[in-house]
């Protein structure tokens, strides 16, 4: 209950990724997804003072990130996360562990896509050809598992 009143929250637990969060640090971050032809985030949470935003994508089926999880879906999700981060021009150093709380009044919150995504739907917007075993995944986000 305390987390609901916090300005920042941890959107995912230790064993599953329900939300993929990107940190976009420029004044037009809220609509940056549209400018580059990326899928609409489910939610944007924007800093009213500078326009920087967290773009949040919800997954209809969470990705298991625990050590006993299946490597193939995890690698696929990591490739999607890396390609989408690149397309959005999002902060490469942001791990997604903590994000702006969409329920906190400090932020400007907008809902763009009410339906949760599956990985195939997200991949429709991305070129994943460089991640088909030839390109190393980043050592952060889903790629570090």
Per-range role (PLM):
Residues 38-44, 81-94:
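Structural alpha-beta junctions
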Residues 105-145:
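Long, charge-rich alpha-helical interaction segments
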Residues 1-53, 59-75:
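Signature for HUH/AEP ssDNA processing cores
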Residues 45, 54-56, 93-99:
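A structural signal for short, well-ordered beta-strand segments and their strand-loop junctions
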Residues 2-4, 32, 91-94, 118:
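Poly-acidic low-complexity segments
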